[in-house]
């Protein structure tokens, strides 16, 4: 039997001065603020983790990387994502593609979108689409208080053959 599933994930982190900015597997050293979190606060990686876990029924980011676990304190978002990818593929799932949208006034993603897609695709092992938007200065993201991300993932299990990818 072939299983095809989708999952959705979201994440939000507060912005604060004196914290490094990491989003979509990239560092933004010129930013004067960064995302506060138990790990590096990478909202894109965290949303993708939740989308993959949701699609496969393996829980959520909080159940895998609880804030009480010191092993993940300060961990890079791509490290968390790599761990989730290993869990997902270890259960026989093939990740077909992922899409993630970063919502906030900063960091500006346009100039580094291709770089972010490449970094995330390398970790995920499947195509990743990255987009970004603002809320036209509305809400907490618009006021510069935080950044959010929304992700979707498509996974399959049970495809036979050398190449189990549906995406060409």
From Swiss-Prot:
Domain of life: Bacteria
Free-text comment on the cofactor: Binds 1 divalent metal cation per subunit.
Catalysis: reaction(s): 4-CDP-2-C-methyl-D-erythritol 2-phosphate = 2-C-methyl-D-erythritol 2,4-cyclic diphosphate + CMP
InterPro entries listed in its UniProt record: MECDP_synthase, MECDP_synthase_CS, MECDP_synthase_sf
Keyword Lyase annotated: yes
Co-factor requirement: a divalent metal cation
PROSITE patterns in the record: ISPF
Residues bound to a divalent metal cation: 11, 13, 46
Gene3D superfamilies membership: 2-C-methyl-D-erythritol 2,4-cyclodiphosphate synthase
Binding sites annotated in the UniProt record for 4-CDP-2-C-methyl-D-erythritol 2-phosphate: 11-13, 38-39, 60-62, 133-136, 140, 143
The protein's annotated pathway: Isoprenoid biosynthesis; isopentenyl diphosphate biosynthesis via DXP pathway; isopentenyl diphosphate from 1-deoxy-D-xylulose 5-phosphate: step 4/6
Keywords for this protein: Isoprene biosynthesis, Lyase, Metal-binding
A Pfam family reported for this protein in Swiss-Prot or TrEMBL: YgbB
A biological-process GO annotation: terpenoid biosynthetic process
SUPFAM superfamilies: IpsF-like
Disulfide topology: none
EC identifiers of the protein: 4.6.1.12
Function: Involved in the biosynthesis of isopentenyl diphosphate (IPP) and dimethylallyl diphosphate (DMAPP), two major building blocks of isoprenoid compounds. Catalyzes the conversion of 4-diphosphocytidyl-2-C-methyl-D-erythritol 2-phosphate (CDP-ME2P) to 2-C-methyl-D-erythritol 2,4-cyclodiphosphate (ME-CPP) with a corresponding release of cytidine 5-monophosphate (CMP).
HAMAP family from the UniProt entry: IspF
Similarity field: Belongs to the IspF family.
Name the UniProt record assigns to this protein: 2-C-methyl-D-erythritol 2,4-cyclodiphosphate synthase
Organism per entry: Cutibacterium acnes (strain DSM 16379 / KPA171202)
Lineage, top ranks: Bacteria, Bacillati, Actinomycetota, Actinomycetes, Propionibacteriales
